[in-house]
Curated annotation (Swiss-Prot):
Protein name: tRNA-2-methylthio-N(6)-dimethylallyladenosine synthase
MTTase N-terminal domain segment(s): 2-119
Function, as annotated: Catalyzes the methylthiolation of N6-(dimethylallyl)adenosine (i(6)A), leading to the formation of 2-methylthio-N6-(dimethylallyl)adenosine (ms(2)i(6)A) at position 37 in tRNAs that read codons beginning with uridine.
Originating gene: miaB
Localization (cell): Cytoplasm
Protein's organism: Aromatoleum aromaticum (strain DSM 19018 / LMG 30748 / EbN1) (Azoarcus sp. (strain EbN1))
Domain (TRAM) ranges: 379-442
Enzyme Commission designation: 2.8.4.3
Names of required cofactors: [4Fe-4S] cluster
Co-factor binding comment: Binds 2 [4Fe-4S] clusters. One cluster is coordinated with 3 cysteines and an exchangeable S-adenosyl-L-methionine.
Reaction(s) this enzyme catalyzes, per UniProt: N(6)-dimethylallyladenosine(37) in tRNA + (sulfur carrier)-SH + AH2 + 2 S-adenosyl-L-methionine = 2-methylsulfanyl-N(6)-dimethylallyladenosine(37) in tRNA + (sulfur carrier)-H + 5'-deoxyadenosine + L-methionine + A + S-adenosyl-L-homocysteine + 2 H(+)
Length: 445
C-alpha cells in the first residue's frame, strides 16, 4: 500500500487544504496517510508565507528529506500552499529534487502533475488561480472525528499593506451555497457534529445561492442555512474581518443558538494611524462599535484577535493605544507577531523600521497582558457547567479525555473513551494556564 506524508504550515485554511490533498490522492492514487516521511511514496509540504520564519522553515524541512529522494528515486516531493504561489519556479531552482509545485487553487491537479512528472522526468509547476475549479474536482470528504472544516470562499481582496494573501491565494471568490451545504450535509452524515466555516475573510461571503446565477445570499443567510442541517450541533467560523461585520451577522448571534460564543476578530493595532498605514479600512472607534454590537447580541461572547507589533513607523504611543484597546475589549487569546516585511507588499517599501529589541519588548508585554486576561476569564468559569464536545484523548494525560467548550477552552477530564465525538456537560473545577479541568455531569448518546 502506497503512503502519503503531508507537513502542514500555517492557518486552518491550510489544514483544510491538506485534508483535500489527502482526499484527492487517496481517490486517484490509493495513497493512505502516514506520520512517517521515511516510509512515504509521496511527501507534500503545504506551506505558509505570512511570516518569514515559516517560509524559511519550509526549505529547511525540504533539506531534511533530500536524502530520501537519493535512496528512493521514485519518491515524489511536492510543495504547495502560499510559498509555492509566491516562489513558483524559484523553489525548483533552489531545491531541484522537488517534483511538483502547486498553489492553493491547483491542489486538485496533483494527480495530473505527478503523472506528468513521472512521464516527462521534469519538475511540474502550476500556481495559477482557476477560482473555484478545485471544488468542482474534489472527491467526497473523508473525516475522522466529530469536528470538521469547510472552506466557503478563497482568497482576499482587502490588500492590507503587510499581507501577501491576495498575491498567493488570489482575490475573493465565494463558493455557491448549494456546494457548501452539500459538503456540510455529507460531513454530518459521517458523524460530524461541529463544523467550522473557513475563509481568509469568511464573513465577506456573498456567493450565488444557486449555480444558475441571479439571487445572491450574504454570510448571515449562509449561517442560517448551515445551522438547519440535521446533525450539525455547533457552528464556528474563521477568519472574520471587522469591515464585513454587518447588522445581519450581529442578529445571527442573537437568533442562532448553534453559533458558538467565540469569535476570532483580527484588529492588528489599536492606533488609528497604524491601522490607516496598514490599510485595514476601519478606525479603533469603529472596531469597538462592532464589539459592542456583537456583545449586545451575545453577552458571553469570547473574542480572540491578531496583533502585529513593530509596524514601520509605529511609536511607543501607538503601541500604548494597542494595549489600551486590549484592556477595553478584554481579548482572551491572540495570535501576535512582530512585523516582518513580506516581499512584494506595499509595507515592505516603508521606511522608519522599528528596532528588533523594541518589537520583542512590545510583543512580550502584549502577550503577557492577554494571558492575564485569558486566565481571569478561565478562572471565572470555575464552578460553572459547560457543554463541551469531546475531541479525543487528552494531550497531557492519555488516560483522560479532552473536550472543547463553546468559548474555545479545552477541558481535560476523566471519562470513558466511548464519549469521544459526543457532547457532555462538565463542571469546571480548575483553571490552568492553557486549559481547564472538569468533572462530567451528564452525557449525550
Amino acid at each position: 500500500m502506497k503512503k502519503l506524508y503531508i507537513r502542514t504550515f500555517g492557518c486552518q485554511m491550510n489544514e483544510y487544504d491538506s485534508d483535500k490533498m489527502a482526499d484527492v490522492l487517496g481517490a486517484s492514487e490509493e495513497l493512505v496517510k502516514t506520520d512517517n516521511p521515511e516510509e512515504a511514496d509521496v511527501i507534500l509540504f503545504n506551506t505558509c508565507s505570512v511570516r518569514e520564519k515559516a517560509q524559511e522553515r519550509v526549505f529547511h524541512d525540504l533539506g531534511r528529506v533530500k536524502h530520501l529522494k537519493q535512496s528512493n528515486p521514485n519518491l515524489i516531493i511536492g510543495v504547495g500552499g502560499c510559498v509555492a504561489s509566491q516562489e513558483g519556479d524559484a523553489i525548483v531552482a533552489r531545491a531541484p529534487y522537488v517534483d511538483v509545485v502547486f498553489g492553493p487553487q491547483t491542489l486538485h491537479r496533483l494527480p495530473q502533475l505527478i503523472a506528468e512528472r513521472r512521464h516527462s522526468g521534469r519538475s511540474q509547476v502550476d500556481i495559477s488561480f482557476p477560482e473555484i475549479e478545485k471544488f468542482d474536482n474534489m472527491p467526497p470528504a473523508r473525516v475522522e472525528g466529530a469536528s470538521a472544516f469547510v472552506s466557503i470562499m478563497e482568497g482576499c481582496s482587502k490588500y492590507c499593506t503587510f499581507c501577501v494573501v491576495p498575491y498567493t491565494r488570489g482575490e475573493e471568490v465565494s463558493r455557491p451555497l448549494d456546494d457548501v451545504l452539500a459538503e456540510v450535509a455529507g460531513l454530518a452524515g459521517q458523524g460530524v457534529r461541529e463544523v467550522t466555516l473557513l475563509g481568509q475573510n469568511v464573513n465577506a461571503w456573498r456567493g450565488e445561492i444557486t449555480r444558475d446565477g441571479g439571487e445572491q445570499g450574504d454570510f448571515a443567510f449562509l449561517l442560517e442555512c448551515v445551522a438547519e442541517i440535521p446533525g450539525i450541533e455547533r457552528l464556528r467560523f474563521t477568519t472574520s474581518h471587522p469591515r464585513e461585520m454587518t447588522q445581519r451577522v450581529f442578529d445571527a448571534y442573537a437568533k442562532i443558538p448553534k453559533l458558538v460564543s467565540h469569535l476570532h476578530l483580527p484588529v492588528q493595532s489599536g492606533s488609528d494611524r497604524i491601522l490607516a498605514a496598514m490599510k485595514r479600512g476601519y478606525s479603533v472607534l469603529e472596531f469597538k462599535s462592532v464589539v459592542r454590537k456583537l456583545r449586545a447580541a451575545r453577552p458571553d461572547l469570547s473574542l480572540s484577535s491578531d496583533f502585529i507589533v513593530g509596524f514601520p513607523g509605529e511609536t511607543e504611543e501607538d503601541f500604548e493605544k494597542t494595549m489600551k484597546l486590549i484592556d477595553e475589549v478584554g481579548f482572551d487569546a491572540s495570535f501576535s507577531f512582530v512585523y516582518s516585511p513580506r516581499p512584494g507588499t506595499p509595507a515592505s517599501d516603508l521606511a522608519d523600521p522599528v528596532p528588533q529589541e523594541t518589537k520583542l519588548r512590545w510583543l512580550a508585554r502584549l502577550q503577557k497582558r492577554i494571558d492575564q486576561q485569558a486566565q481571569a476569564i478561565s478562572q471565572a468559569m470555575v464552578g460553572r457547567v459547560e457543554r463541551a464536545l469531546v475531541e479525543g484523548l487528552s494531550r497531557k494525560d492519555a488516560t483522560e479525555l479532552a473536550a472543547r467548550t463553546g468559548n474555545n477552552r479545552v477541558v481535560n477530564f476523566v471519562g470513558n473513551p466511548r464519549l469521544i465525538g459526543q457532547f457532555v456537560d462538565l463542571t469546571i473545577t480548575a483553571a490552568l494556564p492553557h486549559s481547564l479541568r472538569g468533572e462530567i455531569v451528564t452525557t449525550e448518546t
